[in-house]
């Protein structure tokens, strides 16, 4: 199949790259190996939460923080993508979210500080409206509300953790649990089931009545796991707030993440309905290169290979979950050029025993040139017309610095611009 | 990360048993149309890879809930680790049926070709019967086929018989009035006439039961469009593709059908491409004969099978598709069948239709229609199947369109039944642009 520009991947970097191409009037085809990393990793778009993965003090101004990072680390993917790409990509994403029907807030100027499901403060840059009332720079007392039988959010744990970090004056935290109609003990359910139920008006009203009965009249805001609707989030959230009479904020939970699902489903639908073709269920597994250019990539479609001949390619795979890399016992190999991206004597070298320490596997990826082309051992591009975006770029750990979203946006945007010029 | 064979034993474990590649991410459960619509269905993650760890050949299979899986394969389309979720469910379902015995309905719905042959032979009568409330009441009681589900009408003149006559006709091309009109408007020639023996390509058309017994017109359009492009068409001897047997817990029967088809298709010269106009039948030939049914030699034939729109788009890219389209002023919706997503070829029908002047085609992206072949026919699943499709029906109604295109025949039946709109194969528009009436 022929295409102008082929974007491989289904995460935020791939979507931003595709949108950038679409807005420039280019004809992009989006190739998916499976569902998106948005399902697993995103709720908010974090640009820079911590200057490095050992600092405790959160970054207050993400744009200024990235500028400093670029000055200190000229090899960092942010430095390669450039501050303009971060600005341009963020503006594009913000506008797109609005067009796709989302209500989001935040800017590169200032981070919000939002409580996580275990009650730790986390710096976030762009966030859905339904999360914003959780900002810990505000002083109103917080009530964490969990649900009986739902173990992905333990309100008592969140409250006791948050009380340690945040608890001066009015800043009081408490926890309560509600029993939900239809979710009796013994029923196996996930946040997705809850989110579907919250779209039902009668169910929502029942929960609101139950919650009002255990709340005092005083000023308080309610922190709930993010289950307020699967597709109609902003309506559900606004209506629920009305019914409660207090501000309500959602807290991202473990996968399957309702917030990630909302974001992904709607952006995907929007881009698809505006004319971008998506090739589902076809993992890419080889690139053909001649005279320094990639001539085609091969997808595994049903029964045979589907070659894609494009003028340029954006490899916007998001590391582990998108099948960006093939990990054997000793080697991690990329699926296109079959380069060894990392070699380990034993697989345990890839991991740190402490879950909360930086994980070596997180920074495995393609070394890239200053134009985001995948680089070979000699530092020269493996192919002139291929550009890497998102988590597949080597040399950074997006988890510790809370920068996955910003890097996806900046590199996705820049890779798309480069692909148009290639 | 997915392990690929890079040379050591442990690297191949996940490839050999993809159940090991499941990371429990639950993405499959979130897209499953059945799990979305009923809380009694545990979802593909639990019934597929998670239960698979507890299944073993000598033990009895726990089948509770397995029959609720509709077989849409969206779980496999979605899985970031390429776990063959659906195949685990199908195999377990089949083993359960072998242990417990199959129902009369399993037998009947697995043998749709036999039914169709009978329905076609007795065509006007069978169709009257299928609409008769008393007959339908009996069918519901005896067979478990829901009385509200419209059954497809059979036609007495099968596609295969039509094709024989078509072949026997003089090779003079039929120039329709429309293309005459086109000539008068001097928009150029309408393409060369059919010249038997001089075609560059030969295509074997796997028309499948649907076209043969129910929608001959679609087969005629396929032949028209291919011949219009200077391609010789043959219709090889064929059997049911086997998918009704697979989804009604009879994989042995499906395998028998598959072997018959492969025997016939293997006899074709190696340069003949095989084309199918039924999404799911094409997927059986391409992929499931080899992967699910393990039929020897299936991979080589599967690699030669194309969906009709996929094939035509390939011709277009090779510069071999005639572009002398008559404008078709129409605004249509397109519904992408779940099994088309499993093909991994994108949406070639939409690309093709956008070549035709006047055609505005918009995708209605509301997921599964709910019928899944024989699934939505069953008395205990009819309501569920309509609930699954309700988002699609609402979207079609909201779009105010009275015409929805879909490559899959049972999707078309369901869209018509649920939304009241007319539904056709995308080829209908293409054939019209080529002057077919």
Locate the predicted segments by residue.
Chain B
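Non-heme iron-sulfur electron-transfer modules
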Residues: 1-7, 11, 34-64, 82-107, ...
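Cysteine-centered iron-sulfur cluster-binding motifs in ferredoxin-type domains/subunits
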Residues: 16-35, 61-83, 116, 213, ...
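Short secondary-structure boundary segments
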Residues: 33-36, 42, 67, 73, ...
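Short, intrinsically disordered, charge-biased short linear motifs at domain edges
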Residues: 7-19, 55-66, 226-229, 354-358
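Iron-sulfur cluster-binding electron-transfer modules in prokaryotic oxidoreductases
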Residues: 85-437
């Amino acid at each position: 199949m022929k295409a102008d520009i082929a974007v491989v991947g289904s995460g935020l970097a791939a979507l931003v790259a595709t949108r950038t191409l679409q807005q420039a009037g280019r004809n992009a085809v989006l190739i998916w190996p499976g569902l998106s990393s948005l399902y697993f990793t995103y709720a908010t778009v974090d640009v820079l939460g911590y200057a490095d993965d050992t600092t405790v003090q959160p970054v207050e101004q993400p744009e200024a923080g990235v500028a400093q990072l670029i000055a200190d680390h000229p090899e960092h993917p942010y430095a390669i993508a450039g501050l303009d790409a971060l600005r341009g990509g963020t503006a594009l994403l913000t506008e797109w979210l609005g067009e796709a029907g989302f209500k989001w807030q935040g800017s590169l100027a200032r981070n919000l500080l939002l409580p996580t499901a275990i009650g730790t403060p986390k710096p976030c840059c762009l966030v859905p409206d339904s999360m914003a009332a959780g900002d810990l720079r505000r002083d109103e007392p917080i009530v964490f509300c969990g649900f009986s039988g739902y173990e992905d959010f333990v309100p008592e744990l969140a409250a006791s953790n948050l009380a340690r970090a945040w608890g001066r004056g009015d800043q009081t935290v408490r926890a309560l649990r509600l029993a939900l109609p239809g979710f009796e003990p013994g029923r196996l359910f996930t946040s997705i089931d809850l989110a579907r139920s919250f779209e039902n008006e009668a169910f929502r009203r029942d929960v609101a009545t139950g919650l009002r009965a255990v709340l005092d009249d005083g000023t308080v805001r309610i922190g709930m796991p993010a289950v307020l609707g699967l597709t109609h989030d902003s309506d559900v959230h606004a209506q629920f707030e009305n019914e409660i009479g207090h501000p309500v904020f959602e807290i991202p939970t473990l996968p399957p993440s309702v917030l990630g699902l909302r974001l992904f489903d709607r952006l995907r639908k929007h881009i698809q309905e505006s004319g971008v073709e998506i090739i589902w269920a076809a993992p890419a597994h080889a690139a053909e290169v001649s005279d320094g250019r990639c001539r085609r990539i091969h997808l595994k479609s049903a029964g045979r290979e589907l070659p894609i001949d494009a003028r340029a390619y954006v490899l916007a795979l998001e590391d582990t979950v998108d099948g960006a890399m093939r990990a054997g016992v000793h080697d991690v190999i990329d699926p296109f050029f079959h380069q060894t991206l990392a070699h380990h004597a034993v697989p345990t070298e890839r991991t740190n025993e402490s879950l909360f320490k930086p994980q070596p596997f997180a920074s495995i990826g393609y070394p890239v040139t200053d134009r985001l082309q995948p680089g070979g051992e000699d530092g020269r591009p493996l192919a002139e017309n291929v550009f890497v975006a998102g988590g597949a770029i080597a040399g950074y750990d997006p988890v510790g610095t809370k920068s996955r979203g910003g890097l996806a946006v900046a590199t996705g945007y820049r890779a798309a611009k480069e692909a148009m010029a290639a | 990360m997915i392990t690929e064979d890079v040379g050591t034993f442990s690297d191949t474990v996940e490839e050999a048993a993809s159940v090991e590649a499941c990371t429990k991410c639950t993405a499959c459960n979130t897209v499953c149309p059945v799990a979305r619509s009923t809380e009694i269905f545990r979802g593909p993650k639990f019934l597929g890879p998670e239960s698979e760890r507890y299944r073993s050949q000598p033990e009895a299979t726990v089948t509770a809930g397995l029959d609720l899986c509709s077989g849409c394969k969206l779980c496999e389309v979605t899985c970031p680790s390429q776990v063959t979720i659906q195949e685990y469910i199908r195999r377990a379902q089949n083993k359960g049926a072998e242990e417990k015995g199959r129902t009369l309905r399993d037998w009947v719905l697995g043998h749709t070709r036999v039914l169709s042959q009978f329905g076609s032979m007795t065509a006007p009568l069978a169709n009257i019967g299928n609409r008769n409330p008393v007959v339908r009441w009996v069918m519901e009681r005896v067979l478990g086929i829901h009385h509200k589900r419209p059954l497809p009408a059979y036609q007495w003149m099968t596609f295969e018989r039509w094709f024989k006559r078509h072949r026997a006709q003089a090779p003079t091309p039929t120039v329709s009035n429309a293309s005459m009109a086109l000539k008068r408007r001097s928009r150029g020639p309408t393409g060369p006439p059919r010249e038997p023996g001089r075609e560059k390509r030969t295509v074997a058309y796997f028309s499948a039961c649907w076209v043969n017994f129910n929608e001959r017109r679609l087969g005629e359009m396929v032949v028209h469009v291919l011949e219009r492009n200077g391609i010789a068409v043959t219709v090889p001897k064929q059997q049911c593709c086997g998918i009704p047997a697979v989804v009604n817990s009879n994989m042995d029967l499906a395998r028998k059908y598959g072997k018959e088809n492969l025997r016939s298709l293997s006899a074709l010269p190696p340069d003949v491409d095989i084309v199918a106009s039924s999404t799911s039948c094409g997927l059986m030939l391409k992929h499931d004969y080899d992967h699910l049914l393990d039929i020897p030699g299936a991979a080589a034939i599967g690699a030669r099978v194309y969906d009709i729109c996929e094939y035509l788009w390939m011709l277009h890219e090779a510069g071999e598709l005639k572009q002398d389209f008559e404008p078709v002023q129409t605004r249509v919706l397109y519904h992408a069948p779940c099994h088309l997503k499993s093909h991994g070829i994108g949406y070639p029908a939409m690309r093709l239709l956008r070549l035709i002047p006047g055609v505005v085609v918009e995708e209605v992206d509301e997921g599964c229609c709910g019928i899944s072949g024989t699934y939505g026919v069953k008395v205990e699943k009819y309501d569920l199947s309509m609930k699954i499709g309700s988002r699609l029906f609402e979207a079609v109604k909201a779009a105010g369109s009275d015409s929805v295109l879909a490559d899959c025949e049972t999707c078309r039946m369901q869209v018509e039944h649920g939304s009241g709109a007319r539904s056709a194969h995308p080829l209908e528009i293409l054939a019209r642009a080529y002057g077919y009436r």
